[in-house]
Amino acid sequence: RPAVIIVSDAAIAQLAEAGLVRREAVVGIGRTGTGLAVRDGAPRRPIGTPDQLKAALLAAGSIAWADASSGANAGRNFEGVIEALGIAAEMRAKAKLVRFGVEAVEACGRGEAELAVSQTTEIVNRPGCSLLGEFPAPFALSTGYAAAPVEAGELARAVMARLASAEVRAALDAIGFRSGGDTP
């Protein structure tokens, strides 16, 4: 059994509701958005508005994302985005579907896709590609993460204290987490 668990805010809330973690002990870790990775050397088109996002997606020669059936949040969100933009058929014709968002980013980094969809924290600092940007409203999806001790004891206290340290905050910032998750 782990001393501490770090999962999405939604999962922490379920664990608290089930009595597996104490709600008052939950600490927000940060938030990450869903966005696009662009392969190094590929055009960096703007995606700050729905029209710009649509144009960038249509202009890309290939795009990788997590198959929505795998349960990946970014993949499910992207399926809704391309449906709403009216370009689902065009995107599926040039899709490289993978199981997880990080695999989409890795495929982009290897040159197997011009763009990739994933959580921004899975894009930042990946070789061969970089973050083009987060999806604009109304397509933005932000996921919060939180930590909670699963058991009482010195190890759990030490881990929770470390998670609250300036060094860990700097490391989380460096990989794209925005400060403060919800504390369900």
Where are these regions (language model features)?
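Exported/periplasmic ABC-transporter solute-binding proteins
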Residues: R1-A3, S8-T32, V38-P184
